[in-house]
Amino acid sequence: MKIHVVNNQVEGATVALDILREKLNGGTKVLGLATGSSPLEFYRLIRESDLDFSDVTSVNLDEYVGLGEESDQSYIHFMKENLFNTKPFKQSYLPNGLATDVVAETERYNKILAEHPVDFQILGIGRNGHIGFNEPGAPFDGQTHLVELAPSTIEANARFFDNPEDVPKQAISMGIANIMAAKTIVLMAYGQEKADAIKATVEGAVTEDVPASVLQNHDNVILILDQAAASKLV
């Protein structure tokens, strides 16, 4: 792992943008994208940049079950608001949170991922070490699947909803094996609340109890952390 410790999210986003620009210049054609607060500044810098994605495909990590584009809290809505409306891609794929047959939807998405191997994957990390919506205990060999969200994840995401009771309890997520197939992974984490998860990811045992710890087994992982998130690293 390569670790960049930065002073704030803008500085972290600048580091990530520089890496992305280098990869695009080197022929990257498929981006794996994440939602949540960690990549917001990164997406802002992309919107303000001269980068062109007309020949680039994107695939997103996950989507809430039961939410579609009309919902402000769906991830398709998030991506359109924060990136796609300004920087359209050749193709953009997300799981369909309104699919009536979730098993068929996971199979459809796995096929998309097989057809579009990810060159550059952006990740955040949950306080419990989840990546995507792969909660503790998720198998390292897992593919796209239906997830029962952990209480800590539901609690963490409640701030995005007017009514905490409206937070979805399920999601469709890429599996850990899907994530690990990316050629380059850039994980961004900011804030003291992420410090324990980062320590376990970087310095702990590789265990399914800490999903992000599997990144120790990847050949090209870059962590972008602020000083608070990095504060417990030795």
Curated annotation (Swiss-Prot):
One of its GO terms (molecular function) is glucosamine-6-phosphate deaminase activity. The active site is at D62, N128, H130, E135. Gene3D superfamilies: 3.40.50.1360. PROSITE patterns: GLC_GALNAC_ISOMERASE. Keywords: Carbohydrate metabolism, Hydrolase. It catalyses: alpha-D-glucosamine 6-phosphate + H2O = beta-D-fructose 6-phosphate + NH4(+). Pfam families: Glucosamine_iso (PF01182). One of its GO terms (cellular component) is cytoplasm. GO terms for biological process: carbohydrate metabolic process; glucosamine catabolic process; N-acetylglucosamine catabolic process; N-acetylneuraminate catabolic process. Pathway: Amino-sugar metabolism; N-acetylneuraminate degradation; D-fructose 6-phosphate from N-acetylneuraminate: step 5/5. InterPro entries: Glc/Gal-6P_isomerase (IPR006148), Glucosamine6P_isomerase (IPR004547), Glucosamine6P_isomerase_CS (IPR018321), NagB/RpiA_transferase-like (IPR037171). It comes from the Bacteria. The keyword Hydrolase applies. Its EC number is 3.5.99.6. Catalyzes the reversible isomerization-deamination of glucosamine 6-phosphate (GlcN6P) to form fructose 6-phosphate (Fru6P) and ammonium ion. Belongs to the glucosamine/galactosamine-6-phosphate isomerase family. NagB subfamily. This is Glucosamine-6-phosphate deaminase. It comes from Streptococcus suis (strain 05ZYH33). The gene is nagB.
